[in-house]
């Protein structure tokens, strides 16, 4: 194990002293992504021009990706619209590497979703792999053991020539890294839409478990405490990734950005996880920060800024893979599998012993000071002398102009049912087969089969169930459920309501599993903030999500904003991905999405309206217009209470939410989950809700779920729904003998035919 710096190349170093005497020196601030007003502000803060190293730090830390400079004025709502009741389970909120939630019995869970969109388009395998690695290190840095990951994904049109390249690379990268770490992949989404052509969305969620006393924070306190960098060596990969890739739009005329994509090593990260957990268990580190976006620039400035003093480090002590790296490149490098920690002098020997045990390289960089300054030297000469808060926290804040798009009124007036493509299909059975074989509704087993969903042995549920479920405590069965959801079409039609709908579906998915929703993380994927119409979409979505979280009583614990998701002037649909975490007293009581027992009654909970605008069926007919389904969060809460209580008390044997694809999709998915058919009647539903059989099947009305109820529990279940005043209707029974889905008077489809159609689509395009 090497603990001393590698051979360094000699450079003409731009020192602080030199910067003070050479104000005329030209610097590449624009090439590093800074605006002219931002460069002027840096000069004002420092009272001189920045050194090359300081410029590198400010450029990455003031990037859109790191500073949230265009979004933070809106994101403040997540902290403002929080009641005391919502804070009850919150141990660590927005501002740290990940939120932490109390789940009872002294256990806590930390979870977060982030994006790695732009790198995954440039270099699909490594971009996706390091997206998993980065979010897992966020979880480690909170003091937790990672226990699962999820991956909400969006690609362009399934038949576009470039989609196969992206799908193969991204799915392989996620599976290759996550499987090597030994982390189950318990859920996510796979959506295909031409609006994501050239801008795939690769969002990654990780969850970890820890005891309350094990929580760790990112701060550097205690004058004289040592600062150490450990893990992989620093190389040239990922230099400027935060500013070059994640903070500007793509332009095909610009040179290749492959060098800005990080390269990951999951086996090095696996060792790093165990190494960190041993450090935490022995209380050897006082503060810790993972190195992700902006690398050492971020770690040093955030640790110092969050602490009580300052920091002084020697950059030549950094272990390098490439000795030709300049100081600025070392500061900006986003090489993976690295951590920075603060260690008391008394714990130095213990720290080194743990490093030796795990054969992890490390280098002592410096110490915590009382100066309030972040000072970085290169071979004894100062190249950075800044107030760390100006780098990490007090960057520019833009209240960018925004306005409602002029075209939106016409779009919202163009309802599907009033359009010329809304003809009711003559053969409803064929329509169901068409729906379930469409790219978005087809089985995603081609993807999920490449992931290990059950490694570690604590997975109680995973895709295709509504939520992923993980056991936390083997003795009591205490566990958590997670679901991620978003619908870009809904948000395009109405960003505020679309964001509410994303939360409502994720909340509902957690409840159908039987867990009680507790907290939220979000990844807000949008186009350029410099476009006032995109900024309006963003502002509306954030307001809608914040309001919905308040109404449902679930706080946002943290997340990510990904802007500039557009090629040229074409932006993606606004896509706020929402992750909801819920808790089980015992995961053994979790409810799967498919029925299993012959003769059980099948009930539909909720009201169905003629709501097909933005639906999957409308999408298949090439239509996008109108208003998304009405969201009634009060009804969502009532539905969740019914589902949670019914699951806990053994009143339901299966539960599946209704969302994309409506009742048709839910019936097929519940039947195919365990290969058990059903006999269904829709006439009473059509009469009760004043809709046609076609609308009953394909409407995407919200606050609905399908459940199967044992005959012995029907009276109790009906009484509960009636007492709560919630709409419920017996549609039919589970039929284990027929091997078919029989919707009486409409169609009968064998499960073999449905399964063949459902599972053939992705292999057809991707092999």
Curated annotation (Swiss-Prot):
Any GO MF annotation of the entry: magnesium ion binding
Binding site for Mg(2+) 2: 138, 290
GO cellular component: cytoplasm
Annotated Mg(2+) 1 binding sites: 114, 560
Keyword tags: ATP-binding, Cytoplasm, Ligase, Magnesium, Metal-binding, Nucleotide-binding, Purine biosynthesis
Keyword Lipoprotein: no
Pathways involved: Purine metabolism; IMP biosynthesis via de novo pathway; 5-amino-1-(5-phospho-D-ribosyl)imidazole from N(2)-formyl-N(1)-(5-phospho-D-ribosyl)glycinamide: step 1/2
CDD domains the UniProt entry points to: PurL_repeat1 (cd02203), PurL_repeat2 (cd02204)
Domain of life, source organism: Bacteria
Main localisation: cytoplasm
Positions annotated to bind substrate: 115-118, 137, 262, 334-336, 562
Subunit structure of this chain's protein: Monomer. Part of the FGAM synthase complex composed of 1 PurL, 1 PurQ and 2 PurS subunits.
Annotated function: Part of the phosphoribosylformylglycinamidine synthase complex involved in the purines biosynthetic pathway. Catalyzes the ATP-dependent conversion of formylglycinamide ribonucleotide (FGAR) and glutamine to yield formylglycinamidine ribonucleotide (FGAM) and glutamate. The FGAM synthase complex is composed of three subunits. PurQ produces an ammonia molecule by converting glutamine to glutamate. PurL transfers the ammonia molecule to FGAR to form FGAM in an ATP-dependent manner.
Full protein name: Phosphoribosylformylglycinamidine synthase subunit PurL
Organism in which the protein naturally occurs: Renibacterium salmoninarum (strain ATCC 33209 / DSM 20767 / JCM 11484 / NBRC 15589 / NCIMB 2235)
Classification lineage: Bacteria, Bacillati, Actinomycetota, Actinomycetes, Micrococcales
């Amino acid at each position: 194990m090497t603990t001393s710096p590698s051979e360094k190349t000699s450079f003409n170093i731009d020192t602080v002293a030199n910067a003070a005497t050479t104000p005329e020196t030209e610097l590449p601030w624009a090439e590093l992504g800074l605006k002219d007003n931002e460069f002027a502000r840096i000069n004002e803060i420092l009272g001189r021009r920045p050194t090359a190293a300081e410029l590198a730090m400010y450029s990455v830390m003031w990037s859109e990706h790191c500073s949230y400079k265009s979004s933070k004025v809106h994101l403040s709502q997540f902290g403002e619209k929080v009641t005391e009741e919502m804070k009850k389970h919150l141990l660590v909120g927005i501002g740290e590497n990940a939120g932490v939630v109390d789940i009872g019995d002294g256990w806590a869970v930390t979870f977060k979703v982030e994006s790695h969109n732009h790198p995954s388009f440039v270099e699909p395998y490594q971009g996706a792999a390091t997206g998993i690695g980065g979010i897992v290190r966020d979880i480690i840095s909170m003091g937790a053991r990672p226990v699962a990951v999820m991956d909400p994904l969006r690609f362009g049109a399934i038949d576009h020539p470039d989609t196969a390249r992206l799908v193969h690379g991204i799915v392989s990268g996620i599976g290759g890294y996550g499987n090597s770490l030994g982390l189950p992949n318990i859920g996510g989404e796979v959506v295909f839409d031409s609006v994501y052509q050239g801008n795939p969305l690769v969002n990654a969620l990780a969850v970890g478990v820890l005891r309350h006393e094990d929580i760790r924070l990112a701060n550097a306190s205690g004058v004289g405490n040592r600062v150490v960098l450990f893990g992989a060596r620093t190389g040239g990969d990922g230099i400027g990734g935060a500013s070059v890739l994640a903070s500007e739009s793509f332009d095909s005329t610009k040179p290749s950005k492959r060098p800005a994509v990080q390269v990951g090593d999951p086996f090095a990260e696996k060792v790093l996880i165990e190494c960190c957990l041993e450090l935490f268990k022995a209380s050897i580190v006082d503060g810790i920060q993972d190195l992700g976006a902006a690398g050492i620039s971020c770690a040093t400035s955030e640790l110092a800024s969050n602490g009580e003093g300052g920091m002084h480090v020697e950059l030549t002590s950094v272990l390098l893979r490439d000795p030709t790296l300049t100081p600025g490149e070392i500061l900006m490098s986003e090489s993976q599998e690295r951590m920075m920690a603060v260690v008391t002098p008394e714990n130095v020997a213990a720290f080194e012993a743990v490093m030796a045990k795990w054969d992890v390289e490390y280098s002592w960089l410096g110490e915590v000071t009382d100066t309030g300054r972040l000072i970085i030297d290169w071979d004894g000469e100062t190249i950075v002398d800044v107030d760390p808060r100006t780098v990490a926290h007090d960057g520019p804040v833009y209240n960018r102009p925004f306005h409602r798009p002029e075209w939106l009124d016409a779009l919202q007036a163009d309802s599907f049912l009033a359009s010329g493509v809304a003809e009711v299909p003559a053969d409803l059975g064929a329509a169901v087969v068409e729906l379930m074989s469409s790219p978005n509704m087809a089985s995603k087993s081609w993807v999920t089969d490449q992931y290990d969903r059950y490694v570690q042995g604590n997975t109680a549920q995973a895709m295709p169930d509504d939520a992923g479920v993980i056991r936390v405590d083997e003795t009591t069965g205490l566990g958590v459920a997670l679901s991620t959801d978003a619908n870009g079409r809904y948000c395009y039609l109405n960003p505020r309501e679309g964001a509410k709908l994303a939360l409502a579906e994720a909340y509902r998915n957690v409840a159908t599993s039987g867990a009680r929703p507790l907290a939220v993380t979000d990844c807000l994927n949008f186009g350029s903030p410099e476009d006032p119409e995109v900024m309006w979409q963003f502002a509306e979505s954030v307001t809608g999500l914040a309001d919905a979280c308040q109404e449902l009583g679930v706080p946002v614990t943290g997340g990510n904003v990904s802007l500039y998701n557009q090629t040229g002037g074409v932006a993606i649909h606004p896509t706020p991905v929402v992750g909801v975490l819920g808790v089980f007293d015992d995961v053994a009581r979790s409810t799967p999405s498919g029925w299993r027992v012959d003769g059980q009654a099948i009930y539909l909970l909720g009201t169905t309206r003629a709501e097909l605008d933005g639906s999957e069926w409308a999408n298949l007919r090439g239509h996008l217009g109108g208003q998304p389904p009405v969201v009634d969060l009060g009804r969502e809460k009532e539905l969740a209470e019914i589902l949670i209580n019914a699951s806990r008390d053994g009143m339901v044997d299966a539960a599946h939410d209704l969302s994309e694809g409506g009742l048709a999709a839910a019936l097929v998915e519940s039947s195919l989950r365990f290969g058990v058919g059903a006999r269904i009647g829709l006439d009473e539903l059509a009469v009760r809700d004043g809709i046609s059989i076609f609308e009953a099947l394909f409407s995407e009305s919200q606050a609905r779920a399908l459940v199967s109820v044992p005959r012995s529990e029907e009276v109790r279940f009906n009484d509960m729904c009636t007492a709560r005043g919630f709409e419920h209707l017996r549609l039919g029974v589970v039929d284990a003998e027929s091997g078919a889905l029989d919707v009486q008077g409409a169609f009968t489809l064998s499960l073999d035919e449905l399964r063949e159609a459902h599972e053939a689509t992705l292999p057809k395009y991707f092999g």
